[in-house]
C-alpha cells in the first residue's frame, strides 16, 4: 500500500518543474556524455564512461522518485483557511514565542517540502502538530522537544 505524500500546490509545481528539467535537459545531457565517453574506445578502463554510467543511474533514479512523488501526491487546498480561520497545511502562521518573546513566521508544508532554514515547517513537526486546527489568539504549548515552550498565534494567511 503506497502512502500519500502531502504537498502544497507550490510543492507539486516544483516537483513537476524538476521532472521536466530532468527529462528535457539533464537526461539528454547525460546521454550525450555517455555517448562521448563510449567513443573514447576501450570501455574496460574508461573512467569517463564509468562516471557517465553512474550519473545516468542517478538521474534515472531521481526521475523515478519524482514521478512516484507526483503520482502519490495529495495536494492540500488551503484556499479555505481564511474562511475557517484555522491553521492548516499550507497556512503561513505568525506567532509570538515565549522563549525569546519575538514574533516569528512559518509556513506549514508536507514533510518532503520542509526546509527549516526557509521557515517551511513539516506538518509532522512538534510545532505544526501543536498549532494545526488552532485559531488567531490561541496559545499552545510546544511539547515533545527538549525544552517545551508556548506560542500565541498572531495571524494566519
UniProtKB/Swiss-Prot annotation:
Residues 1-75 form a coiled coil. GO terms for biological process: DNA-templated transcription elongation; regulation of DNA-templated transcription elongation. Keywords: Coiled coil, DNA-binding, Transcription, Transcription regulation. InterPro entries: GreA/GreB_C_sf (IPR036953), TF_GreA/GreB_CS (IPR018151), Tscrpt_elong_fac_GreA (IPR006359), Tscrpt_elong_fac_GreA/B (IPR028624), Tscrpt_elong_fac_GreA/B_C (IPR001437), Tscrpt_elong_fac_GreA/B_fam (IPR023459), Tscrpt_elong_fac_GreA/B_N (IPR022691), Tscrpt_elong_fac_GreA/B_N_sf (IPR036805). Necessary for efficient RNA polymerase transcription elongation past template-encoded arresting sites. The arresting sites in DNA have the property of trapping a certain fraction of elongating RNA polymerases that pass through, resulting in locked ternary complexes. Cleavage of the nascent transcript by cleavage factors such as GreA or GreB allows the resumption of elongation from the new 3'terminus. GreA releases sequences of 2 to 3 nucleotides. Belongs to the GreA/GreB family. This is Transcription elongation factor GreA. It comes from Mycoplasma capricolum subsp. capricolum (strain California kid / ATCC 27343 / NCTC 10154). The lineage of its organism: Bacteria, Bacillati, Mycoplasmatota, Mollicutes, Mycoplasmataceae. The gene is greA.
Amino acid at each position: 500500500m503506497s502512502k500519500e505524500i502531502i504537498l502544497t500546490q507550490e510543492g507539486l509545481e516544483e516537483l513537476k518543474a524538476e521532472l521536466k528539467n530532468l527529462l528535457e535537459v539533464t537526461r539528454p545531457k547525460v546521454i550525450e556524455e555517455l555517448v562521448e565517453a563510449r567513443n573514447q574506445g576501450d570501455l574496460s578502463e574508461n573512467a569517463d564512461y564509468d562516471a557517465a554510467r553512474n550519473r545516468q543511474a542517478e538521474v534515472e533514479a531521481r526521475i523515478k522518485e519524482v514521478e512516484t512523488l507526483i503520482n502519490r501526491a495529495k495536494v492540500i487546498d488551503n484556499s479555505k483557511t481564511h474562511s475557517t480561520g484555522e491553521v492548516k497545511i499550507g497556512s503561513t502562521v505568525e506567532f509570538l514565542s515565549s522563549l525569546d518573546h519575538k514574533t516569528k513566521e512559518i509556513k506549514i508544508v508536507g514533510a518532503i517540502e520542509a526546509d527549516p532554514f526557509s521557515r517551511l515547517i513539516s506538518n509532522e513537526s512538534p510545532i505544526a502538530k501543536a498549532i494545526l486546527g488552532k485559531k488567531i489568539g490561541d496559545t499552545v504549548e510546544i511539547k515533545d522537544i527538549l525544552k517545551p515552550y508556548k506560542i500565541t498565534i498572531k495571524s494566519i494567511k
